């Protein structure tokens, strides 16, 4: 069985998706696009531009833009010019990836199962949980989903969040909870010493532990850090230390670190060199790692991403293939490669892998974590 451990169904990008107004949603999208590495260009002459057309590079403030579509793609107008970037791949002509599109891609690439992830930009938890539930109910045993929450709600009404999660998991097709610590910190005062593993959240995590619900942690750095600067890397390691303490408190509960490790942050002279402490969380036998090389390194390396093989080999040595999960970020990975190519990195290449290791990485590990037995 081949399982894509990290994929998406996407509602239309320029729709409200549960937010109070479309303007509210588009500001979230502007913030996301304005910090993203995908290139910007002027739609008139295709000359390169940059993210300063979205975000003031000195203050971090959002620019006053007018959103539009050009040739079916998202674009924005500012200072009399129209700009775009290919955040979603061109094939998503209506800025959406409904489950039918994902299933067709899976069928063609010979992927049996996809695990649908969440993110605030895709929709509010109420909207997104309903949207993804409909997808997995339409394609049972082909699609599974993670539960979306607003991490800040844990400060305001933890019991309500627990109740919602319990209701969602009873609907079926749920493989776990996605938790993004960085969004929890956004609701705290900068002077607060609390973390998402502080005593105030113990009732929440105790409830998740009692449910035996796997947790998919998306570590995006801590407070006030800028991605891939030294402050971000330091805060990433600090976040791992919080997770290590959490793992020790809740032994036996399956955990997955999504997106892999910060490959780009530790890229030096074409090689990824991690500090020793980055492996500490995997001392817990229940801590698993997703690996999504093409979506993260596709702007730098070409298929079959041979440059990544030394760090993949090291990850297998330090963690074990039985705790590594292949994922793609589909449909987003189509910015850089086909679905088959993303799979063939492990199905065909990485010659150092044994047959058993290949099977674990491209499906066996995910199946065990997700509780799939057939």
What is the meaning of each model-derived region?
Residues 140, 175-176, 183-185, 190-325:
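Catalytic pocket-lining loop regions of alpha/beta-barrel enzymes
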Residues 96-106, 129, 155-168, 274:
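Short, acidic/polar
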Residues 7-8, 120, 260, 329-330:
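Active-site metal-binding loops of divalent metal-dependent hydrolases
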Residues 6-14, 218, 259:
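Histidine-centered divalent metal-coordination motifs
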Residues 89-90, 105, 110-123, 133, ...:
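Short, well-structured secondary-structure segments
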């Amino acid at each position: 069985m081949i399982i894509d451990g990290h994929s998406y169904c996407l509602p239309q990008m320029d729709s409200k998706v549960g937010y109070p107004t479309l303007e509210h949603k588009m500001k979230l999208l502007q913030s996301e696009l304005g910090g993203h590495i995908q290139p910007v260009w002027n739609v008139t002459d295709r000359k390169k531009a940059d993210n300063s057309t979205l975000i003031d590079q000195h203050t971090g403030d959002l620019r006053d833009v007018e959103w539009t579509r050009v040739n079916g793609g998202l674009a924005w107008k500012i200072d009399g010019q129209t700009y775009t970037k290919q955040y979603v791949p061109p094939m998503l002509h209506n800025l959406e990836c409904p489950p039918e599109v994902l299933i067709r891609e899976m069928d063609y690439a010979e992927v049996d199962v996809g695990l649908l992830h969440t993110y605030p930009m895709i929709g509010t938890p109420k909207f997104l949980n309903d949207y993804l539930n409909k997808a997995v109910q339409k394609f049972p045993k082909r699609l599974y989903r993670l539960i979306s929450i607003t991490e800040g709600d844990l400060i305001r009404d933890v019991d309500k969040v627990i109740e919602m999660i319990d209701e969602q998991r009873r609907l079926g097709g749920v493989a776990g909870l996605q938790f993004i610590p960085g969004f929890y910190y956004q609701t705290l005062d900068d002077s607060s010493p609390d973390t998402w593993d502080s005593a105030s959240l113990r009732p929440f995590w105790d409830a998740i532990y009692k449910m035996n619900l796997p947790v998919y942690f998306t570590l995006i750095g801590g407070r006030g850090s800028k991605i891939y600067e030294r402050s971000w890397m330091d805060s990433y390691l600090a976040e791992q230390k919080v997770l290590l303490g959490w793992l020790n408190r809740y032994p036996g509960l399956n955990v997955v670190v999504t997106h892999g490790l910060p490959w780009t942050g530790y890229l030096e002279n074409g090689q990824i060199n991690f500090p020793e402490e980055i492996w500490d969380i995997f001392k817990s036998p229940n801590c698993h790692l997703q690996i999504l090389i093409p979506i993260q390194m596709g702007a730098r390396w070409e298929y079959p991403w041979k440059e990544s093989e030394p760090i993949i080999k090291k990850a297998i040595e330090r963690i074990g293939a039985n705790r590594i999960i292949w994922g793609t970020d589909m449909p987003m990975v189509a910015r850089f490669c086909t679905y088959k190519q993303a799979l063939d990195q492990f199905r065909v290449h990485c010659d150092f892998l044994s047959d058993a290791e290949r099977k674990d990485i491209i499906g066996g590990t995910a199946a065990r974590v997700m509780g799939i037995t057939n």
